[in-house]
């Protein structure tokens, strides 16, 4: 192992319930759809917003409307997270592990499906730049055609720390 690739939402920061709540509200208000737990597991969690919106409304939305709804979802998510400080911390043990990696000069990156609009907010809430170079934080910029579990975003993250994905955990 030469480097470490981290997911973020739902693994290093336990915010999945907040994303699910925001998507459930968006689905109901904009598309009159009630999302089930199965819908969330199969079509929402870990997926970029563009793929989630394609699932909710396959062809009826303009690009402008998709962006508007995606931005609204992220605003709602941040409001939910900010209103409950219980969510605003790293997973137990993560800080110690990050300190160990940093001290031992182990390259590390984050690969997250989070929207670009959340990036500044995460940096305010979490000490990300203390542990990860700015260029090693890979987020959904709209260019990923496939959502997780597809390895595409992890491959990009490995390249950002100048490693082959096979040499990372």
Where are these regions (language model features)?
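Short, well-ordered alpha-helix to beta-strand connector turns
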Residues: 1, 105, 132-135
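N-terminal helical cap/lid subdomain that shapes the substrate entry/recognition surface
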Residues: 2-95, 99-100, 104, 117
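A generic structural signal for short coil/turn motifs at secondary-structure boundaries
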Residues: 13, 108, 145-147
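Intrinsically disordered, low-complexity boundary segments flanking structured domains
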Residues: 64, 108, 124-126
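Substrate-recognition "cap/lid" segment bordering the active-site pocket of phosphatases
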Residues: 87, 115-169
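Short active-site oxyanion
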Residues: 105-109, 166-168
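Short beta-strand/turn micro-motifs composed of small residues
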Residues: 112
């Amino acid at each position: 192992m030469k480097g470490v690739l981290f997911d973020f939402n739902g693994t290093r920061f336990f915010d999945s319930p907040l994303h699910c709540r925001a998507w459930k509200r968006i689905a109901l208000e904009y598309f009159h759809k009630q999302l089930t737990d199965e819908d969330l597991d199969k079509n929402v969690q870990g997926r970029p917003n563009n793929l989630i919106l394609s699932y909710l409304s396959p062809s009826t939305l303009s690009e402008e409307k998709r962006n508007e709804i995606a931005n609204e979802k992220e605003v709602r998510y941040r409001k939910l997270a900010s209103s409950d400080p219980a969510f605003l911390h790293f997973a137990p043990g993560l800080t110690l592990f990050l300190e160990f990696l940093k001290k031992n000069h182990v390259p590390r990156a984050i690969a997250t499906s989070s929207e670009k609009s959340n990036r500044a907010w995460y940096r305010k809430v979490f000490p990300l730049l203390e542990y990860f170079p700015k260029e090693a934080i890979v987020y959904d910029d709209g260019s990923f055609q496939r959502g997780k579990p597809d390895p595409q975003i992890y491959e990009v993250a490995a390249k950002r720390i100048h490693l082959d994905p096979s040499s990372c955990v």
